[in-house]
UniProtKB/Swiss-Prot annotation:
<feature type="modified residue" description="Phosphoserine">
    <location>
        <position position="136"/>
    </location>
</feature>
<dbReference type="GO" id="GO:0005634">
    <property type="term" value="C:nucleus"/>
</dbReference>
<dbReference type="GO" id="GO:0010968">
    <property type="term" value="P:regulation of microtubule nucleation"/>
</dbReference>
<keyword id="KW-0963">Cytoplasm</keyword>
<protein>
    <recommendedName>
        <fullName>Spindle pole body component SPC98</fullName>
    </recommendedName>
</protein>
<feature type="modified residue" description="Phosphoserine">
    <location>
        <position position="124"/>
    </location>
</feature>
<keyword id="KW-0206">Cytoskeleton</keyword>
<dbReference type="GO" id="GO:0005822">
    <property type="term" value="C:inner plaque of spindle pole body"/>
</dbReference>
<dbReference type="InterPro" id="IPR007259">
    <property type="entry name" value="GCP"/>
</dbReference>
<comment type="function">
    <text>Involved in microtubule organization by the microtubule organizing center, the spindle pole body (SPB). Probably part of the microtubule attachment site at the SPB.</text>
</comment>
<dbReference type="GO" id="GO:0007052">
    <property type="term" value="P:mitotic spindle organization"/>
</dbReference>
<dbReference type="GO" id="GO:0000930">
    <property type="term" value="C:gamma-tubulin complex"/>
</dbReference>
<comment type="similarity">
    <text>Belongs to the TUBGCP family.</text>
</comment>
<dbReference type="GO" id="GO:0000922">
    <property type="term" value="C:spindle pole"/>
</dbReference>
<dbReference type="GO" id="GO:0005737">
    <property type="term" value="C:cytoplasm"/>
</dbReference>
<dbReference type="GO" id="GO:0000278">
    <property type="term" value="P:mitotic cell cycle"/>
</dbReference>
<dbReference type="GO" id="GO:0051225">
    <property type="term" value="P:spindle assembly"/>
</dbReference>
Length: 846
């Protein structure tokens, strides 16, 4: 079949009488030349058609005809090969009405019942075949108008050919090689249960859909088979975690998923056996809800291996309030299955203080250091509270009470040896929690916890105070290690004077212990030793010798310590190993004042005796008068040093230690039962006495005014063991963080004038005080030797001693001037600090 004659016949059929035969022949020839040109382009067609439009009549009918011709030729220009053009024209020719086909000499081979089965030979090679199936309409040439011309009359009168062929007859050839829907339904049930089949084999968690399934059914299968893939994924997780040693909460989650998979299997089997599924559409409609449920279960188990059970519980608790009812229902079901196990964790901790088999799924955990020893546990209970892991359905404050209940139980049972009481306590609340188990974590559960917390904390305080004398020990620490009882320190120094003057490497420990006992008997602390009830309080007192190296004397290395044993060692931080050793640091600092004061008192008495001795010499001459005057004047300088030492000691003891101790005891008094006639009073600066805080109402008033239990309105707060330790640590921290004590970089206050931290400036001043008293001691010794020589009338020796006497006088004056200069700068630093207390201290140091 030739190109030009066929094209001529088709154009003549599309636009009869549009052009004369000669013009039409010329037009077709020009078009064929363009089609055969190697540089052909559809843009060349426009000018050619415009030229021949001028040769025809201008009317609406001719415009429509030219539009049809242009549209037809546009599709033809899209074909590259001449043979393909001829095939295209042949197909197009067969679609023309029969009365026009008679005019065309060539035989038609277009779209009809005969050639539809072999339509692949007519397809254009321009478009790639469909990825779905070869028998798809998607594979027909987009450059042609076959689909549009088949589906619409295109202004032509339908011929007998169209009326005799139905749409099914036209489409049946496309489905000859496809798989019927009935056969697909026979195999789908296997795939839904993640079982491979001949039609739909599984390949590494993928389902292979045959290419002979039409596009529509293939799309439905993509949706339906999601259930099979989800079922396979969940089944794999169930089998995997059944073989592992996982926590009970995760096991409960796996059991729930396993039951859901069993229900899904039964549903699929019933669906297949019922015969209600007649198409893929109906199958998808029936299984859609199960797909949604399996999706939700897969979402919840997405990170099952990495996350802990309590994390799942927290997440499920959030989804319990989800807007989607299906998600809410599934989350609630899973939450209820896991919360019972979490309730057991709580019960074991609340009634027995046990953390066994929690698998790290609890907000309370053991914190045992692998490098630690058994001795470390006498200072702390190795249990920690992780606030970040507290679930949202338990209030943070209540979670802390839960933590303290179990910790207090361990404290009483293991450290206080209250075995009988803890057993009765455990049985009592085990019954209460067991009876509340059907309610779960509810308001009633919270009320039981509040009552249990109050009971165990009150009993803990009672045991600490009555059995282990907690408050007595606190006051003993303040009176001894913080030098609250000055008579004890004076007696101790007086008794240990000779021992402290010996070298540190030869200090006998047994003598220090004996001196310590004698000092207690001579002081106001003797009631602690003489009372059988309080003897354990004073028994913890111990004398220690610091290791400062060779050349030190007892005064430099002596210190006091207090040895605590459980349970008090857990609530009172007294020089714990690897700690800051707060009491040791404070004692050693205050020891400087006591040491200086002792030597000044000693030298003052010695100087007074020397002066009185000189006055008794016969022949009271001007030389003796001069010596007496010089000693008296030096005594005035000594008094200024001594006053500075006493003022600073008083400030440390009264304004720093005593004030912080009062604050601590006010907090500790909350744990005691006060009578209604005892009030907490404070004295203002002007001497006025006022009530500290608000006067609390009587318990009877609260009972009559409300039907609630009086315990719910308790105003006084009882401190638990952690709070007792915290109060004591705060007391020590506040002392050491004071500007005159602080040594930490973040707490140090540097003087504006000296450029030194206040404690450093003060230590230098105290060293000056001590150096002064040493020179002053030498002066007194020389003065005493002069007195002896004068009594013996050894004037030559007296003259030599007078030279030494005057040299020491000059050194004393020099040290005094140096001290006054340092004191002036120190006072300026305090005055310029901006702190009112330090400003008043600077004024008192004038």
């Amino acid at each position: 079949m030739e190109l030009e004659p066929t094209l001529f016949g088709i154009i003549e059929a599309l636009a009869p009488q549009l052009l004369s035969q000669s013009h039409l022949q010329t037009f077709v020839s020009d078009v064929v030349n363009l089609l055969r040109s190697s540089t052909k382009s559809a843009t060349q067609l426009g000018p050619l058609i415009d030229f021949y439009k001028l040769q025809s009549l201008d009317s609406p009918e001719t415009t429509i005809m030219w539009h049809k011709i242009e549209k037809f030729l546009d599709a033809l220009f899209g074909i590259q090969n001449t043979d393909d053009m001829v095939k295209y024209l042949s197909v197009f020719q067969s679609l023309l009405p029969s009365n026009y086909r008679a005019k065309i000499v060539q035989k038609s081979s277009g779209l009809n019942m005969e050639n539809l089965a072999n339509h692949e030979h007519l397809l254009s090679p321009v478009r790639a075949p469909s990825i779905y199936t070869e028998a798809s309409f998607e594979n027909m040439d987009r450059f042609s108008e076959r689909r549009s011309m088949v589906s619409s009359p295109n202004r032509y009168v339908p011929s007998s050919t169209y009326s005799s062929v139905t749409l099914r007859q036209l489409s049946n050839p496309y489905y000859v090689n496809t798989i019927p829907e009935e056969d697909i339904l026979k195999y789908v049930s296997y795939t839904l249960l993640a079982t491979t089949s001949a039609l739909f084999p599984f390949d590494h968690e993928q389902i292979q859909i045959p290419s002979k399934i039409p596009n529509f059914e293939s799309g439905l299968l993509h949706l339906i088979f999601e259930a099979g893939l989800l079922y396979q994924s969940l089944g794999y997780k169930v089998e995997k975690f059944r073989m592992l040693n996982i926590s009970p909460m995760k096991k409960a989650l796996i059991i729930e998923i396993s039951e859901e998979l069993q229900n899904y299997t039964a549903f699929v089997n019933n669906l297949v056996s019922s015969g209600t599924v007649v198409s893929l559409k109906s199958l998808y409609r029936e299984i859609y809800e199960n797909i949604i449920r399996l999706r939700i279960y897969c979402r919840f188990t997405e990170h099952l291996e990495e996350l802990s059970g309590d994390t799942f519980l927290i997440e499920l608790n959030i989804f319990k309030s989800h807007g989607d009812l299906t998600i809410r229902k599934i989350a609630t079901n899973l939450f209820n299955s896991m919360i019972s196990l979490y309730y057991e964790y709580l019960m074991n901790w609340l009634t027995k203080g046990l953390l066994r088999a929690t698998y790290g799924e609890f907000f309370i955990a053991e914190n045992t250091d692998t490098n630690g020893t058994d001795d470390d546990f006498i200072y702390h209970i190795p249990i920690e509270f992780n606030q970040e892991r507290v679930p949202a359905f338990i209030p943070k404050e209540l979670a802390y009470k839960i933590f303290m209940i179990g910790k207090s139980y361990i404290f009483l049972e293991k450290y206080c040896k209250e075995v009988q009481w803890t057993n009765e306590f455990s049985k009592k609340y085990h019954v209460l929690y067991q009876s509340n188990s059907y309610r779960g974590i509810s308001t009633n559960f919270f009320e039981i916890i509040n009552d249990q917390y109050s009971e165990i904390v009150n009993h803990t305080n009672q045991i600490l105070n009555q059995k282990f004398h907690y408050r007595d020990v606190v006051f003993a620490l303040k009176n001894i290690l913080l030098m609250g009882k000055s008579d004890f320190m004076d007696a101790l120094i007086e008794k240990a004077n000779d021992i402290l003057a010996t070298p540190s490497d030869s200090l006998p420990n047994y003598k220090l212990t004996r001196v310590l006992q004698e000092a207690v008997q001579l002081s106001s602390l003797r009631h602690l030793m003489n009372s059988p009830r309080n003897s354990s309080v004073i028994n913890g007192l111990d004398a220690r010798v610091l290791d400062l190296g060779h050349g030190s004397v007892g005064w430099d290395v002596f210190t006091l310590d207090y040895i605590l044993y459980p349970p008090l060692s857990l609530v009172l931080n007294v020089n714990r190993p690897f700690g800051r050793k707060e009491y040791l640091r404070i004692f050693n600092f205050l020891w400087r004042f006591k040491k200086n004061n002792y030597f000044y008192q000693k030298e003052m008495l010695k100087s007074n005796d020397i002066i009185r001795s000189f006055k008794k010499i016969r022949g009271y001459n001007p030389l003796i008068r001069d010596i007496i005057n010089k000693l008296s004047r030096i005594s005035i300088l000594r008094t200024q040093f001594q006053q500075f030492n006493s003022k600073m000691e008083s400030y440390y003891l009264n304004c720093i230690i005593e004030e912080n101790f009062k604050e601590m005891t006010r907090k500790l008094q909350r744990t005691e039962n006060k009578s209604q006639n005892q009030f907490d009073l404070i004295r203002l600066n002007n001497g006025t006495i006022e009530l500290n805080g608000i006067l609390t109402p009587k318990a009877e008033v609260l009972t009559k005014s409300s039907s609630s239990k009086p315990q719910k309105h308790a105003i006084e707060k009882t401190l638990n063991i952690d709070e007792l330790e915290s109060v004591h640590n705060t007391f020590l921290t506040n002392i050491l963080s004071h500007k005159l004590f602080a040594t930490n970089t973040s707490e140090i206050s540097v003087g504006d004038y000296s450029g030194q931290p206040y404690p450093t400036s003060l230590v230098l001043l105290l060293n000056s005080v001590y150096e002064f008293v040493k020179v002053y001691c030498n002066l007194n010794d020389i003065g005493y030797e002069i007195f002896i020589k004068m009594n013996l009338n050894d004037h030559e020796a007296s003259n030599g001693l007078l030279g030494k006497f005057n040299t020491n006088l000059k050194e004393i004056v020099s040290q005094y001037k140096n001290f006054k200069d340092r004191l002036y700068i120190f006072r300026a630093d305090l005055k310029n600090d901006g702190d009112e207390e330090l400003f008043l201290l600077s004024k008192s140091l004038r």
